[in-house]
């Protein structure tokens, strides 16, 4: 990935990609790691054929003015409400625009719109796979550092024909004697699914009111230099 050109507005480009080779026959392909020919449909003999080798990737263009950056293209996301699955051999990709701003001291603001995603076992983007997958996802959020011991954040997601999700987090570090401290972290998610969404994460069978709430609280004790 390049840096930025000089000037009031700086421009840059970047590329991202991966290549894979399958060792052996692996007749049990279909585990969301190895892509399948014909989108996983069986052939005339009832077999599903996996790729022997494959590559994926894309590019980005980016611009920066002052302390604000805008990126468009293929990206690996790590937002609380929209994150790429990196637990497979290769990561999930999203295609779209992401703005990140640090114009105000100690405040980070993000906003973005994504129109395609590519799972780890997909050769083509979801727009080409039977019309299923991501239609349009809009994300927004902010994180503010009040001081060295306290920060808070909020992020939101509106994924068309899928779900709305909201996330809040508060993190506080309590200094103690002898270079030790206690850190408290509180997180919460609220998700509401559209009637047509495919999900098992629901607390009711009422399709017009499918939602869930998740809360998490953790405490960590730290001592010594860290």
Predicted regions and their residues:
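Outer membrane beta-barrel
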Residues: 2-126, 142-151
């Amino acid at each position: 990935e390049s840096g930025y050109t000089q000037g009031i507005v700086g421009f840059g480009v970047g590329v991202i990609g991966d290549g894979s080779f399958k060792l052996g026959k692996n007749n049990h392909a279909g585990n969301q790691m190895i892509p399948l020919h014909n989108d996983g449909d069986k052939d005339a003999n009832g077999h599903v054929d996996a790729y022997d080798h494959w590559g994926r990737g894309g590019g980005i263009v980016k611009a920066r003015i002052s302390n604000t950056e805008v990126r468009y293209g293929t990206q690996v996301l790590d937002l609380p409400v929209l994150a790429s699955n990196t637990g497979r051999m290769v990561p999930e990709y999203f295609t779209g625009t992401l703005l990140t701003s640090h114009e105000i001291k100690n405040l980070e603001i993000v906003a973005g719109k994504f129109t395609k995603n590519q799972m780890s076992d997909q050769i083509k983007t979801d727009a080409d796979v039977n019309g299923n997958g991501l239609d349009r996802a809009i994300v927004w959020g902010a994180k503010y550092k009040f001081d060295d011991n306290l920060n808070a954040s909020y992020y939101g997601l509106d994924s068309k024909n899928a779900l709305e999700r909201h996330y809040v987090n508060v993190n506080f570090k309590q200094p103690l004697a002898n270079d030790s401290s206690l850190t408290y972290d509180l997180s919460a998610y609220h998700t509401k699914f559209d009637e047509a969404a495919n999900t098992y994460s629901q607390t009711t069978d009422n399709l017009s009111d499918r939602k869930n709430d998740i809360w998490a609280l953790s405490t960590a004790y730290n001592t010594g230099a860290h």
